């Protein structure tokens, strides 16, 4: 039935709003919905072709009703596509503002899902190629915007830290970083007592885990 696939996209979008991560892009459903729109548009053209631009809705109500249903179905599919993609871009922008490496996280999610035996074997990222490009350009735009105020971290947390120094455990290797008190090398499973402001971004990005 017309609109069923579009409704599936809306359901995916609704679930996405309640998730901390971005689920895999529904490529096949998106393609099926756009294909349905093209088919409906083709049907409309074929219905109107015999009338040569002189169609009178009141004179042929059966054709008029078919055209209305097709038109409303196309509009609904378009709104479902827009809602699905808007939800995902909002989530992507939120992650960029939080300082997350979105492309790396999406790849890690797919690898974790594949290792658990529930993912698709060919996927390498939960983002579509267009979303990956969008994230790159949005990140560049945000970096240029932040560059105007070098003394203020616009993406920093609005909540003041309760503790100046915290204990952290390294979740994945992050290499050497410079802190106010010197350089430290972050290797997996190591633990440090550091100033929170020096590692807050690494915690957000998933490299470190705050203890206590």
UniProtKB/Swiss-Prot annotation:
List keywords of the entry alphabetically: DNA replication, Nucleus
InterPro entries membership: GINS_A (IPR021151), GINS_bundle-like_dom_sf (IPR036224), GINS_Psf1 (IPR005339), PSF1_C (IPR056783)
What is one term from the GO cellular component aspect held by the record? GINS complex
Q: Which SUPFAM superfamilies match?
A: GINS helical bundle-like
Where, per UniProt, does this protein localize?
A: Nucleus
Q: Where is the composition biased (Low complexity)?
A: 113-128
- GO term, biological process aspect, one: DNA strand elongation involved in mitotic DNA replication
Q: Which CDD domains match?
A: GINS_A_psf1, GINS_B_Psf1
Q: Where is this region: Disordered?
A: 107-131
Q: What does the UniProt function comment say about this protein?
A: The GINS complex plays an essential role in the initiation of DNA replication.
Give the similarity note.
Belongs to the GINS1/PSF1 family.
* Subunit field text: Component of the GINS complex which is a heterotetramer of SLD5, PSF1, PSF2 and PSF3.
* Annotated PANTHER family: DNA REPLICATION COMPLEX GINS PROTEIN PSF1 (PTHR12914:SF2), PARTNER OF SLD5 (PTHR12914)
Question: By what name is this protein known?
Answer: DNA replication complex GINS protein PSF1
User: Gene name, please?
Assistant: PSF1
């Amino acid at each position: 039935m017309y609109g069923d696939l579009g409704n599936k996209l809306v359901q995916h979008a609704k679930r996405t709003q309640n998730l901390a991560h971005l689920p895999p892009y529904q490529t096949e459903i998106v393609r099926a919905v756009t294909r349905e729109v093209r088919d409906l548009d083709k049907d409309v053209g074929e219905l109107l072709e015999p009338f040569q631009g002189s169609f009178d809705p009141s004179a042929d109500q059966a054709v008029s009703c078919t055209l209305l249903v097709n038109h409303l179905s196309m509009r609904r599919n378009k709104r479902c596509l827009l809602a699905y993609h808007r939800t995902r871009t909002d989530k992507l922008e939120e992650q960029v503002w939080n300082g997350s490496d979105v492309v790396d996280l999406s790849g890690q999610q797919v690898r974790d899902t594949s290792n658990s035996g529930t993912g698709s074997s060919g996927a390498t990222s939960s983002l579509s190629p267009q979303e990956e490009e969008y994230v790159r350009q949005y990140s560049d735009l945000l970096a240029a915007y932040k560059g105007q105020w070098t003394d203020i971290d616009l993406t920093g947390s609005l909540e003041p830290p309760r503790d100046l120094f915290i204990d952290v455990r390294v979740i994945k290797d992050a290499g050497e970083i410079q802190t106010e008190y010197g350089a430290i090398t972050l290797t997996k499973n190591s633990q440090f007592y550091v100033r929170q402001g020096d590692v807050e971004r690494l915690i957000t990005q998933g490299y470190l885990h705050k203890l206590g």
